[in-house]
Design a protein with these regions (language model features):
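Surface-exposed amphipathic alpha-helices with a cationic face
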Residues: 5, 48-53, 73-78, 147, ...
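Electropositive phosphate-/nucleotide-binding environments in soluble metabolic enzymes
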Residues: 35-42, 68, 92, 133-140, ...
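C-terminal helical cap(s) of enzyme catalytic domains, especially alpha/beta-barrels
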Residues: 95-107, 112, 116, 125-164
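Non-catalytic alpha-helical scaffold/packing segments enriched in small hydrophobic residues
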Residues: 39-47, 57, 69-73, 97, ...
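A C-terminal functional module that forms or caps the active site or interfaces directly
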Residues: 61, 65-120, 124-128
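Conserved anion-binding
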Residues: 1-62
């Protein structure tokens, strides 16, 4: 795997998208390299989790919200990596299911607010402006709604480390 040679920065690797066609490539079985026969997305998660950059907290995986079983499997293989999770909102990903299947169980990501998950909502916000007489107000309202549904900060607004 190639990564930037810089010692700082962060890279998200595409692991498993949730569109139905993704299984055609990301679900291909791969074998060899001292690893078990497994789907390609699992191999990506396994290789990413074993990288020195993972221990340094500089690698995460993109795993789609509507690919529930794949999210659970990727989390089992890459327990400590942060996940960027698109597909909540217009694509129909379920927040509760993502939280149940995707929270980090080890490493730096597990100790962060949000359980190592960064849930992305795009069209769920931007689609609100399509037919609105005041697109700005519609975007603001939709963003506010999603922010309240995805809130990860404690009521005082700051993670404990920031309060210390």
């Amino acid at each position: 795997m190639l990564f930037r040679s810089r010692e700082r920065g962060f890279t998200y690797l595409l692991c498993r998208t949730s569109n139905p066609e993704s299984a055609e490539l990301q679900g291909l079985r791969v074998a060899g390299g001292g690893f078990p026969d497994e789907p390609l997305y699992v191999r990506v998660a396994r290789l990413a989790a074993g990288r020195p950059e993972a221990l340094a907290g500089r690698i995460g995986l993109v795993v789609g919200a509507t690919a529930g079983e794949a999210l659970r499997t990727a989390r089992a293989v890459a327990a400590g990596l942060p996940f960027l999770v698109p597909g909540v909102g217009a694509q129909g990903g379920d927040i509760a299911a993502v939280l149940a299947a995707g929270q980090a169980t080890a490493g730096r990501a597990a100790s962060r607010f949000g359980g190592g998950l960064m849930i992305n909502v795009g069209r769920g916000v931007t689609d609100a402006a399509r037919e609105a007489s005041d697109p700005g107000a519609a975007l603001s309202a939709a963003a506010g709604e999603w922010c309240s549904r995805l809130a990860i900060l404690p009521p005082d607004g700051l993670p404990p480390a920031a309060n210390e």
